[in-house]
Amino acid sequence: MAKQKQQYVTIKGTKDGLTLHLDDRCSYDDLLKEIEERLVKQAGVAPDSPLVSVHLKIGNRYLTPAQEEEVRALIRRSKNLVVDSIESNVMSKAEAIEWMRKTEIVPVSRIVRSGQVLHVEGDLLLIGDVNPGGTVIAGGNIFILGALRGIAHAGYAGNKQAIIVASVMKPMQLRIGDIMSRAPDSKTDEGNEMECAYIDEHNQIVVDRLQLLMHLRPNLTRLERRM
């Protein structure tokens, strides 16, 4: 009995088109050969057939931009197939550096004075105060071990899950994502409890006790893991 040839391409039909699971252990050349045999040479479709979206799942294989373009062009030769997305479990070094830059916690020890702006891409851990007229901006969360009396903008790129935490919460203005709020005029006592600001289910910024944060954002554990 002839040995059955191992398949490197698994094709599954979905309501959105086709999903191709590509083997991530075979050689790149073998993968191209099988794609050509199964999708291009066997393609018998009418010239006016509608386009079908193809989603590629390549597992733990990394394709360079040139290889991605080669695979897209090869599949496009089947007349009615077009690659809509390529999903991989790995990322390039540049992508990894960019991801770390946007998700890392940046510790800063200083006082942000009036007219000064402190800007970070990831989460900000500020050990110090933000004076009136000072501004802190972060792509992620903002943690202030000190007094916030100026302006704080968390999740500046649109992350509405971001939060702002301060030992003393007396801000001139709070912003999370594209939502803005000013501190209530009636708040005069500073108290001894740290407070947090977040966007609630009504799409409004709410300031409350820090102890509620574990219930509001149960997945917020990166700060604890990295300190």
Curated annotation (Swiss-Prot):
Share what the entry says about its subunit structure, partners included.
Interacts with MinD and FtsZ.
What's the protein called, per UniProt? Answer: Probable septum site-determining protein MinC
Q: Which SUPFAM superfamilies match?
A: Cell-division inhibitor MinC, C-terminal domain
According to its UniProt record, which protein family does this protein belong to?
Belongs to the MinC family.
Q: Which UniProt keywords apply?
A: Cell cycle, Cell division, Septation
The gene from which this protein is expressed is minC
Function in brief: Cell division inhibitor that blocks the formation of polar Z ring septums. Rapidly oscillates between the poles of the cell to destabilize FtsZ filaments that have formed before they mature into polar Z rings. Prevents FtsZ polymerization.
GO terms (BP aspect): cell morphogenesis; division septum assembly; regulation of cell septum assembly
Domain of life of the source: Bacteria
Which species is this record about? Geobacillus kaustophilus (strain HTA426)
| Pfam families registered for this protein in UniProt | MinC_C, MinC_N_1
Disulfide bonds listed in the record: none
